[in-house]
């Protein structure tokens, strides 16, 4: 007999290396836009949740294996991923951004030809750059923060990642103050959804209903202002 969704504590997993979306406080407590959003969903949907910080590499395998119930990790909704998992309606829309030393600009991804570009293993930025096939050398990291450290040290020429992450490192990180700027934003939007295993229909319906409410009553925009400084 299946246990009702509301009767058990659901494990939510995310890779807490993407401020302001998902990251750890100095006391190692998960925080960020996605974290606040999933807690708001849980409150409205009468769900008990606990959050687990996991590495991005292998995060989908862990969901498939049943190690956790929901992914809340800035997970881009793609046709390939939808073949294996179910996604909620989007809770955030983003574009890929290229960060370079402050003052540098490029007109397209093609301008990265011959440059070394850092990113995190398996994220959309890597896929976008690979598909563009512009002749850039891609250097992948376990943590996007390491890519920005190498950018600051001159070991890579640029970093590509989701625009809220790019803006955080370019504008809000005091240790990188004045060092970085957004050199280019790719014009193909992507949408983040919470991700569950196939067949979890009751859970998916609860999540979607709560997301729709959060959008309708302005709570989503309040979270955007809190974490990104703007609701745009």
Roles of regions detected by a PLM:
Residues 7-75, 83:
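Extracytoplasmic small-molecule ligand-binding "clamshell" domains
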Residues 16, 92-100, 163, 167-212, ...:
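Periplasmic-binding protein-like
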Residues 35, 51-61, 104, 124, ...:
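Short helix-initiation/N-cap motifs at beta->coil->alpha
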Residues 35-44, 110, 115, 121-123, ...:
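Extended ligand-binding regions for polar small-molecule ligands
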Residues 46-48, 65-73, 115-116, 134, ...:
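Alpha-to-beta junction loops
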Residues 48, 124-141, 177-182, 209-232:
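Ligand-binding clefts/hinges and TM-proximal coupling segments of bilobed small-molecule sensing domains
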Residues 58-61, 73-83, 128-131, 157-188:
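A ligand-binding cleft/hinge motif common to bilobed small-molecule-binding domains
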Residues 100-116:
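Flexible hinge/capping segments at coil-to-helix
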């Amino acid at each position: 007999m299946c246990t009702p969704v509301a009767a058990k504590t659901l494990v939510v997993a995310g890779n807490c290396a993407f401020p302001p979306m998902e990251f750890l406080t100095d006391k190692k407590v998960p925080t960020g836009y996605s974290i606040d959003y999933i807690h708001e969903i849980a409150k409205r949907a009468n769900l008990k949740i606990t959050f687990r910080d996991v590495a991005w590499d292998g995060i989908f395998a862990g969901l498939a294996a049943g190690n956790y119930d929901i992914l809340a990790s800035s997970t881009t909704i793609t046709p390939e991923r939808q073949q294996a998992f179910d996604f909620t309606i989007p809770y955030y829309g983003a574009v890929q951004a290229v960060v370079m030393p402050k003052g540098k600009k490029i007109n397209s991804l093609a301008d990265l030809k011959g440059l070394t570009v850092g990113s995190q293993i398996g994220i959309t930025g890597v896929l976008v750059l690979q598909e563009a096939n512009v002749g850039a050398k891609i250097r992948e990291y376990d943590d996007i923060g390491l890519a920005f450290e190498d950018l600051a040290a001159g070991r890579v020429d640029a970093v590509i990642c989701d625009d809220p992450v790019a803006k955080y490192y370019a504008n809000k990180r005091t240790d990188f103050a004045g060092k970085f700027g957004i050199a280019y934003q790719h014009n193909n939007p992507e949408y983040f959804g919470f991700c569950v295993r196939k067949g979890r229909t009751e859970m998916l319906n609860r999540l979607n209903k709560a997301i729709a409410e959060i959008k309708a009553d302005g709570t989503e925009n309040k979270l955007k202002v809190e974490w990104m400084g703007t609701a745009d």
